[in-house]
UniProtKB/Swiss-Prot annotation:
InterPro entries: TatC
The keyword Protein transport is annotated on this UniProt entry: yes
Protein name: Sec-independent protein translocase protein TatC
Similarity comment text for this entry: Belongs to the TatC family.
GO molecular function: proton motive force dependent protein transmembrane transporter activity
BP-aspect Gene Ontology terms: intracellular protein transmembrane transport; protein transport by the Tat complex
Region of interest: Disordered: 243-270
Top-level taxon in the UniProt lineage: Bacteria
Compartment annotation: Cell inner membrane
Organism name: Desulforapulum autotrophicum (strain ATCC 43914 / DSM 3382 / VKM B-1955 / HRM2) (Desulfobacterium autotrophicum)
Length: 270
C-alpha cells in the first residue's frame, strides 16, 4: 500500500469534519440573523423577571454608547446557537456514529435527549422560580437615597451564568447514573453519603443564591430530589455484580478453550 493510500482515510475524515463544521457555522449564522430580527423582544423576555421585580415604569440603562448594540448581538448569538442545536447535534452524530458500535449508538441518543431535557428544566427553574425571589431580595436594598440601575451588559452576563449554572446542576441524575453504569459509584455508596450530599447542596445553595433562607431552600430541595432520582437511576441502570461475574466467567471459559486448542496439536503428535 502506498503512502498516499494510507493517508487518504485520514484526509477524508478531515474533509468531512471541515464540511460539517462549515454547515454548523452556517446554521448558527442563519439562527443569528433570525434572532437579531427579534432582538428587542428576546431581550425583553430575558429581562422580564427583573422588570417585574423593579415595578412599573422602571427601565434598564446602558453606560457605554456601544453597550446596547453589543448586548443585542450577544443575545442574538446565544439564541442562534439554541436555534441551530438540532443541526449541530445532527452533524456531530453523523460524524461520530460510524465509529460506534450498535450498543453504543443505542446508549448515546437517550443520553443526549435526557441531557437536553434536564438542562432545559434546570434553566427554566432558575428563570421562573429563583430569579423573581432573588431579584426582589437584591432590590430590597434600595432606599430613598439609593436606587438600583442595572445595566444591560451586567444583567446579560449575570443571567447567562445563572441559567447555565442551573442547567448544569440539573444534570446531576444523568452524571451519577453514568458513573454507576461505569462502576464508579454504587447505590449503597449514594445512600451512605446522602447526608453529606444534603450538606453540600445547602452549602452550594447558600453560595449561589442570595442570602435568603427561602431562596436557599428553594434551590436545595430540587437538588435533594435530583439526588434521589440519581439513586433510582443507579439502581436501574447501574453496573450489576452478577453481570461482572458472568463476564469474568465467560472470559475464563474463552481462555480455557483457547488453551485447550493450543495443547491439542501437541497431544495428537504424541
Amino acid at each position: 500500500m502506498s503512502r498516499e493510500e494510507e493517508k487518504s482515510p485520514f484526509t477524508e475524515h478531515l474533509g468531512e469534519l471541515r464540511d460539517r463544521l462549515v454547515r454548523s457555522f452556517i446554521a448558527v449564522g442563519v439562527g443569528f440573523v433570525i434572532a437579531y430580527c427579534f432582538k428587542e423582544r428576546l431581550f425583553d423576555i430575558l429581562t422580564a423577571p427583573l422588570i417585574a421585580a423593579m415595578g412599573e415604569g422602571q427601565k434598564m440603562i446602558f453606560t457605554g454608547l456601544p453597550e446596547a448594540f453589543f448586548t443585542y448581538l450577544k443575545v442574538s448569538l446565544l439564541t442562534g446557537v439554541i436555534l441551530a442545536t438540532p443541526v449541530l447535534f445532527y452533524e456531530f452524530w453523523m460524524f461520530v456514529s460510524p465509529g460506534l458500535y450498535r450498543k453504543e449508538k443505542r446508549f448515546v441518543l437517550p443520553v443526549v435527549i435526557l441531557s437536553i431535557f434536564f438542562f432545559c428544566v434546570g434553566s427554566s427553574f432558575g428563570y421562573f422560580i429563583v430569579f423573581p425571589y432573588g431579584f426582589q431580595f437584591f432590590l430590597g436594598f434600595s432606599s430613598d437615597t439609593i436606587q438600583a440601575m442595572p445595566s444591560m451588559k451586567e444583567y446579560l452576563g449575570f443571567a447567562s451564568k445563572m441559567l447555565l449554572a442551573f442547567g448544569f446542576v440539573f444534570e446531576l441524575p444523568l452524571v451519577l447514573t453514568f458513573m454507576a453504569r461505569m462502576g464508579l459509584v454504587s447505590v449503597e455508596f449514594l445512600k451512605k453519603n446522602r447526608k453529606y450530599a444534603i450538606l453540600i447542596f445547602f452549602t452550594g445553595a447558600a453560595l449561589i443564591t442570595p442570602p435568603d433562607v427561602v431562596t436557599q431552600i428553594m434551590m436545595a430541595i430540587p437538588l435533594m430530589i435530583l439526588y434521589e432520582i440519581s439513586i433510582i437511576g443507579a439502581r436501574v441502570f447501574g453496573k450489576k455484580k452478577d453481570s461482572d461475574e458472568e463476564e469474568a466467567a465467560e472470559n475464563s471459559d474463552v481462555q480455557t478453550d483457547k488453551s485447550t486448542d493450543d495443547t491439542t496439536p501437541g497431544e495428537d503428535q504424541n
